[in-house]
Amino acid sequence: MTCLFGMLLSTGALLKVLDPGPLTQDASSSLFAIGDQTIDRVFETNVPLRAEHWKSIYIHQSLTSGGDAMSLGRGGAGLADHFVIGNGSGCADGEIQIGRRWSQQLPSGLPDAARSDSISICLVGDFNHNHPTATQEARLAQLVTALQHQFRISSEHVLLVTRRNAGVLGAGTNFPVAELRAQLIP
């Protein structure tokens, strides 16, 4: 009995030491990565999908060499985007991370997003100096076409700005706009 009590006490103390503490606003439990076969998981949100609300998709770069949704979400308001697609530095190449704003069906927190009814996708990277990875490009096309299909968003409402202008972050001058547009649903 004493041995069992000692083991339970030790286990409890170890768990207390290893406890990371409560999740912050940016570290929502709804932040998870999805793989190729599970793209439909983006439609499994904590609240009902607001299908009538989402009218466009806004794609931009992080202007960082690496990172993930947690690092991009540091600051007062947390992650401003609905989705983050990794470049292999900070998270897996092509990994799609889903943020709290999407799982709660909230508007993007980006000041430069075109409209409040835009779904915001951030690709990790600085595409004014580098190019997205082939895996990022493939996963972006997969995500965008799934969103287009689900919410009936035409390709003309997939918004990309290739250069910074009037405070708009954009997708970067090296972003392959024509290649992405060729894969979109008209």
Predicted regions mapped to residue ranges:
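Glycine-centered secondary-structure boundary/capping sites
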Residues: 75-77, 114, 152
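A sequence-level detector of short, solvent-exposed, charge-rich linear segments
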Residues: 67-68, 72, 102, 115, ...
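Short, conserved "active-site rim" segments that organize catalytic pockets and cofactor/ligand binding
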Residues: 38-104
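Short, surface-exposed glycine/acidic/tryptophan-bearing loops
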Residues: 98-116, 120
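Basic/polar, cationic surfaces and motifs that engage anionic cell-wall
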Residues: 1-53, 96, 117, 123-186
